């Protein structure tokens, strides 16, 4: 299994390879950037992991990262996209997205059962979920 640090190094190498950024990698990069760009590296991988946990969950009924990310009312940033104001954080997010997309099954899980997360004040439905752990400013939950 790869640690998140090792996976990030792979992402750094992949960033320079032509043709690897497809729609799925782009959607995953956006989700990581808008949801967790200032979080520790494990937090970025946790957002990627939650995204793909949703892809593989029958609850969300979508089979792509773009599908689960753009499902209505799942991620607040999708309702009003903001410009990329921190290029270094975008690049960091893209390295995580690339490494997770191409090598995710070999990355040691950070939040293996998580389907939900939040930062700040929890919403009402969080009380019905099972709390798993906190990474940086995010709390992660399963059903």
Name the predicted role of every residue range.
Residues 1-11:
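Sec-dependent signal peptide recognition
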Residues 10, 14-143:
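Bacterial extracytoplasmic/cell-wall-associated proteins, especially those involved in peptidoglycan
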